[in-house]
């Protein structure tokens, strides 16, 4: 089972992976919750159903005009038993389905079927204009496909607008709040050094223009603050080393304000001390972060969205992991667990 596209729009080589899996008789299940709009035009990559995945889950409500909680499960081959799927749907599905939600799904599907060509053509036109307008940003950076190598992404879904902050004193959460409180623009999520805006076929030119204008205004403000910071750094160097400066001063400054990959750092794997089920069967205790270093986690801790665990029960709580938690807290990211993490409390296996 793989996720494609990811929250940020990274798409895997579904066709290639499916071929390898099928050689070994293994079905490929694709969590394509954020890819319901793929394959209908607009120059977007093809969807996983047409690329040979055996089961594909798509959330209509994430990228198409449909109510929250509406999704589709596509069964695409005989490698997955339809009877088995029906069995588990009977166990987990509600016995009181919402006819409003189901009717909304039908309207969504009919809209795409009857008006999809026009809607997706306009969608592509507006996205292209937006990305072109944002090419001149200096302290902010709107990600494009050129930022990703083939090793990082087979393809990319640019309906996800990923906006990076290049100023080390600002975070993705800061940008998220700035756009919300000052410009009344609601983004989807924030991470360490970027924020994510979701778009759909229903977005109009006005929305893209408002976001572009807001980003340019914020960018100008950051450039002004950055110039003052740069001058201060240069003055401090002159005081310390005299008036001679070398050509690397600009690069030194840029390195100071540009953080490395926050995601790679915060999701660094933790050493496993025991299986999850073993940790959950043992006694637990709630302790401070400082007391927890060197102990074993008894909790799932994750950033939401997207909800990928930073640590799970049975993994070692290292001093480095505690520092990563403190970094998330300092950036005001949505850190979740069963304890009050913002009060620096964490649940450990007690033995």
Regions found by a protein language model. Give the residues of each.
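Terminal helix/beta-alpha structural elements that buttress the NAD(P)+-binding lobe
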Residues: 338-351
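Conserved C-terminal alpha-helix-loop-beta "cap" of PLP-dependent enzymes
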Residues: 135-231, 237, 246, 253-316, ...
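Conserved PLP-enzyme active-site core in the AAT-like
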Residues: 1-143
